[in-house]
Every structure is written in structure tokens, then in C-alpha cells.
């Protein structure tokens, strides 16, 4: 999307950048395949507390518009020195989404394997390891005695942690490590399961649509401790 910066400011405490994209019949890069006029606005706010991100879609068409949000977020590993083996990732996953040979959901959910159960408890090494490309439902995990919705990467040797916190609109995850031999892994929060508009059961897939003039927003936080 060719976003344009619509607002930017800097203070002693934070930096904010707002960017927007409008899709309509006169700007048909997306409209020709998705014939709904809409506005997408993303706000980034950076401070000593971390990075906050908010994305909002507004339906500017005359019909209900399907809307699903997902972010392809790479987390650098290692990020604070050490070796890949020092780091584990935890993610608030519930069940595993069964995928077909095209990596599309079959509609079935599976219990977490022994490998992926480590995402909930203890952590899983996700770089310098085997390929991972898997989908999951969202279910909160316990972090420091509190329920947590999101992903985190921890250096087990130093205790340094990076948190990627999501809101309650995130209902699914895709986790991808690009073959396992690169210095990053992507915990990708999604408001609906991959291919949700074509799912047999839209309700459990997270599919949603918004009426003309309505908006749909999601918020995320990225910070270190």
C-alpha cells in the first residue's frame, strides 16, 4: 500500500507518526481486486516505554466490508548478545490449526504437539533450528503471575525479554521462522484465521465485516524488560 504520512510530531517524551492509505475506484491498485472503498490509518508512537501501534480500517463504501488484520512481525534473535541457543519464544497459543499441503487451514483444530506446547510453558527455541510454519488459536498465558496476550522472546542467560503484546481483537497466530536458519522469527497476530472468508464456519474462523461508516481497530505494544 502506498501510505502517506498524515501527521508527525516529536516531543521530549515521545515521537508519533501517523500514515494513511485510501482505496477507491480512482486508486485501483487494491480496489480492482477488493471493490470496497476504505481508509487505513496506522499510528506509531515511540517512547521510553516502547513502541505502540494502532491500525484502523474505516469502511467508506455503501456495502458491508470484510475486514481482517494481520501483521508479519519479525523479532530479531539474538537481540541482546549471545547465541540463538540462549533465546526462547513464548506465545499465547491455544490449539494448533491444521493446514493442508498449500498451508491453508482445513477447518480442524489439533492439540498442541510436544514441540509447540513449549510456546506456552518454558519457551521454544525458534532460530538456528528446524523450520516452523504453523497456525494457532489465541489463549492467554501466565507471565509474571498475570494473564498475557502476546508473544515474548527471552534471553535465558541474561533474563532480558522483548514483549509483543496484542489486544483482544487478536484471535489467531501464524508463527514462521523462514526455514529456521535466519536471525529472526515472526509471531504474526491475526484478527481472523488465514483464508477466513472462504472458511466453512465463518463464526469460528474470526471472520467479521463492518457496515458503511464503521471502523475496526487493533492495538499492539512492543517493549523490553
What are the roles of these predicted feature ranges?
Residues 154-194:
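Glycine-rich active-site loops that engage anionic ligands at enzyme catalytic sites
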Residues 55, 208-224:
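Short Pro-Gly-centered flexible turn/kink motifs
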Residues 6-17, 45-50, 83, 156-157, ...:
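A short, structured loop/turn motif at beta-sheet edges
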Residues 77, 81-167:
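Active-site/ligand-binding surface loops and adjacent short beta/alpha elements
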Residues 55-61, 177-178, 224:
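Asparagine-centered strand-capping/turn motif at beta-strand->loop junctions
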Amino acid at each position: 500500500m502506498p501510505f502517506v504520512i498524515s501527521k508527525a510530531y516529536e516531543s521530549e517524551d515521545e515521537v508519533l507518526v501517523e500514515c494513511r492509505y485510501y482505496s477507491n475506484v480512482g486508486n485501483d491498485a487494491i480496489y480492482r481486486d477488493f471493490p470496497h472503498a476504505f481508509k487505513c490509518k496506522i499510528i506509531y508512537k515511540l517512547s521510553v516505554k516502547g513502541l505502540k501501534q494502532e491500525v484502523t480500517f474505516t469502511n467508506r463504501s455503501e456495502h458491508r466490508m470484510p475486514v481482517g488484520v494481520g501483521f508479519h512481525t519479525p523479532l530479531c534473535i539474538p537481540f541482546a548478545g549471545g547465541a540463538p541457543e540462549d533465546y526462547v519464544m513464548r506465545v499465547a497459543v491455544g490449539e494448533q490449526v491444521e493446514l493442508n499441503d498449500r498451508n491453508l487451514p482445513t477447518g480442524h483444530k489439533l492439540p498442541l504437539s510436544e514441540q509447540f506446547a513449549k510456546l506456552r510453558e518454558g519457551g521454544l527455541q525458534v532460530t538456528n533450528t528446524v523450520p516452523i510454519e504453523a497456525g494457532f488459536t489465541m489463549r492467554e498465558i501466565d507471565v509474571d503471575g498475570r494473564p498475557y496476550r502476546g508473544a515474548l522472546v527471552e534471553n535465558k542467560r541474561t533474563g532480558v525479554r522483548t514483549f509483543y503484546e496484542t489486544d483482544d481483537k487478536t484471535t489467531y497466530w501464524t508463527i514462521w521462522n523462514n526455514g529456521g536458519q535466519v536471525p529472526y522469527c515472526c509471531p504474526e497476530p491475526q484478527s481472523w484465521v488465514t483464508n477466513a472468508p472462504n472458511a466453512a464456519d465463518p463464526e469460528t474462523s474470526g471472520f467479521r465485516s463492518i457496515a458503511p461508516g464503521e471502523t475496526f481497530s487493533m492495538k499492539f505494544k512492543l517493549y523490553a524488560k
